[in-house]
Every structure is written in C-alpha cells, then in structure tokens.
A protein has these predicted regions:
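Rossmann-fold cofactor-recognition segment
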Residues: 49-63
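Rossmann-fold scaffold of SDR-type NAD(P)-dependent oxidoreductases
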Residues: 12, 75-83, 106, 130, ...
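Conserved mid-core segment of classical short-chain dehydrogenase/reductases
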Residues: 83-102, 119, 142-145
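Catalytic Tyr-X3-Lys loop
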Residues: 92-111, 129, 153
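Conserved glycine-rich cofactor-binding loop
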Residues: 15-16
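C-terminal helical subdomain
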Residues: 196-247
Length: 247
C-alpha cells in the first residue's frame, strides 16, 4: 500500500504532537482521515487546519471506545498513538496510582483496540500501527511506568500478529519506536526540560549528550514506509539513521 488516496485512515490520539504530524501527513496524501482524541478544542483546531478530516472526542481508554470508533469508519490503516503525558518524577517519589498512569492509558488503548480488530477483523490487507518509544528499550527513570508500558505495547503488537496469522486474517501489525526524545513535541519538550533538571545540566547540554534525534517527519515517513513495504509486521525503531527491525 503506497497510494493513500481515499484510503480510510483512523488515528487514535492524533490532535497534537506526533499524532498531529501523522494526521497532517495522511491528509496531504489524500487519505480519508479520522482523528480520535480526548480534547474537543484541539480536535476543532485540527479540523479547521485540515479540511475534510473527521474527528471524534472520545476517551480511548474506555472499554467501549474501540467499538465506537470502528463503527464510524472501518480503517484500512489504524494508528494507535494516544497516551498520557509522562509524570517526569523519579519513581521513589511516586505513589502507585501516579506511577501506573502509562499502563492505564498507552497500554490500555493498545489492549482494547488490538483485541477489537481481532474479534471483528478489519478487511484483509489492513495495517495496524502502534507508536511505542525508545524508552521501551533503554528505560526512563523519571517517567513512572512509561518505559514498561511502551515495551508491553511491543509485546501486544507481536501477540496480535500471531493471533491474526493463526486465524488467517491477513492483517499486518507494526510497532514503531522513535529512538530519541523529540523536542518538537509537547511530550518531548517536557521530557528534555525535566531530564535536564534531573541530571543537573542545561537543556542544551542534555540534548548534546543525547546525540542526533529523529524528527516527527522522520517518524511519519517511517510509518508510511512500514505500511507500504509489503513486508511482514514486527517491531521497529526509527532514529536519525533510519529504520531498523527490533528482535
């Protein structure tokens, strides 16, 4: 799949940040873009900026969210990029409820939507993309359960692919982890600020030590490539050097 003209694309959590860049990318390709997010205000702004994009204000962590979303549009491409802002506090200073936020948002969204498309399969050839994080590989000591939650998304992606293959559903499941924090997103800017404080350095020094980072556009381009390359699903990492498969 390389031509996205009139292809139904549903994005979960795409009213801002990386998700918005993905929405802009698919819109520019002529796709039938449907964006789901919690915030009505940010959705209205996106709809004004991207004429023709449909939106739905919905808490994607709710048990009925997947059924509501899939009833509006059956996607040929489903992208799960929703999640919570990280707490950015070292874990000894967190209680369990604050520590656990990413499990109850990012992972729960993946759990619910992956189950839904396996219970009521999308049409053959459909692709489901889960946005994970490089934190799933390297950890993130001031982000609560974020690293573990993003790692679990990778596992769920693999489980979903195996379940699809066993049922002969001809669906492709892909997870993509941006390797570095991206200053261009709200999540990334907050992480850079708080990690600089945590390490006792300036933001510039933290970024310099981190090395070159991929941009949101790099990530969007990687998503398009993984959807259209005709290869099996799997877990992938995107960095400033390009896309690589994760074992």
């Amino acid at each position: 799949m390389s031509d996205f003209l009139n292809v139904p694309v549903t994005l979960i959590g795409a009213s801002r940040g990386l998700g918005r860049v993905l929405a802009e990318t698919f819109h520019a390709k002529g796709a039938q873009v449907f964006v789901v997010a919690r915030g009505r205000e940010s959705l209205d702004a996106l709809a004004r900026d991207l004429p023709g994009v449909r939106t739905l204000a919905c808490d994607a962590t709710r048990d009925d969210a997947a059924a509501r979303v899939l009833a509006v549009q059956e996607p040929r491409v489903l992208v799960l990029c929703g999640g919570a802002m990280t707490v950015n506090i070292a874990f000894p200073d967190l209680d369990w409820d604050r520590f656990n936020v990413s499990w109850e948002t990012d992972t729960r969204i993946s759990f619910n939507f992956l189950k839904a498309v396996l219970d009521k399969p999308l049409k053959p050839g459909a692709v489901v993309v889960t946005m994970s994080s490089g934190a799933a590989i390297n950890g993130s000591p001031i982000s609560g359960s974020y690293a573990g939650a993003k790692r679990m998304q990778m596992f769920l992606n693999g489980y979903a692919q195996k379940a699809s293959d066993r049922k002969g559903l001809d669906m492709k499941f892909v997870s993509l982890a941006p390797a570095r924090i991206m200053a261009e997103t709200e999540l990334g800017a907050a992480g850079i600020r708080d990690y600089a404080v945590y390490n006792g350095v300036t933001e510039a020094a933290f970024l310099n030590a981190m090395g070159p980072a991929q941009t949101p556009k790099d990530v969007a381009d990687a998503v398009l490539t993984l959807i259209g390359d005709g290869k099996p699903g799997g877990n992938f990492l995107v960095s400033a050097e390009g896309v690589s498969a994760l074992s």
